[in-house]
Curated annotation (Swiss-Prot):
One of its GO terms (cellular component) is cytosol. InterPro entries: T_IF-3_C_sf, T_IF-3_N_sf, Translation_initiation_fac3_CS, Translation_initiation_fac_3, Translation_initiation_fac_3_C, Translation_initiation_fac_3_N. It is found in: Cytoplasm. This is Translation initiation factor IF-3. The gene is infC. The keyword Phosphoprotein does not apply. Belongs to the IF-3 family. Pfam families: IF3_C (PF00707), IF3_N (PF05198). HAMAP family: IF_3. Monomer.
Length: 181
């Protein structure tokens, strides 16, 4: 299936609530976050029912476990809402690739450079691949000149992350990152 929205994983009860709590005594915190102290589980459940809320085990590993009186449904909703907000704020950085040849003509060079600029302005990383074919391997200096030209043309927009020192296989790879954050 293509497209569509990614389903956000629903948080399944990470905390024990009400009668699921197994400890005899708990360290209780009320709705406002005030420490009530160490009380029996029975009295903590009674206080939670009195206010019409749930008793939620916050820290099960401490001795005695820390429990808080709260509306558990609202707590889960707020937690999932904050996770959604964090995902919205994240920018996925893609790596775009543009391929050059040592003898790329001026018109093609300008078109590819324009695409490089567009990718960098969108905040993506760009992988510039310079490919050698046949006897072009003899003229590696031309390839380095092309990469240096790209580097100098994009000096205001991009930072060079990786610059090739030698040919790897039949290609040279340079990786550029956008300067603006």
């Amino acid at each position: 299936m293509k497209g569509g929205k990614k389903k956000i994983q629903i948080i399944t009860k990470p905390n024990k609530i009400n009668h699921e709590i197994g400890a005899e005594k708990v360290r209780l915190t009320d709705v406002n976050g005030r420490q009530i102290g160490i009380v029996t589980l029975k009295s903590a459940l009674y206080k939670a029912e009195e206010v019409g809320m749930d008793l939620v085990e916050i820290s099960p590993n401490s001795e005695p476990p820390v429990c808080r009186i709260m509306n558990y449904g609202k707590f889960l909703y707020e937690k999932s809402k904050s996770i959604k907000e964090q995902r919205k704020k994240q920018k996925v950085r893609n790596i775009k690739e543009i391929k050059f040849r040592p003898n790329t003509d001026e018109g093609d060079y300008k078109v590819k450079l324009r695409n490089l600029v567009r990718f960098l302005e969108e905040g993506d990383k760009v992988k510039v691949t310079l490919r050698f074919r046949g006897r072009e391997m003899v003229h590696q200096k031309l390839g380095i000149d092309v990469l240096n030209r790209i580097k100098s043309d994009l000096i205001e927009l991009a930072v060079v992350e990786v610059f090739p020192s030698r040919v790897e296989g039949r290609q040279m790879i340079m990786i550029l990152t956008s300067k603006k954050k």
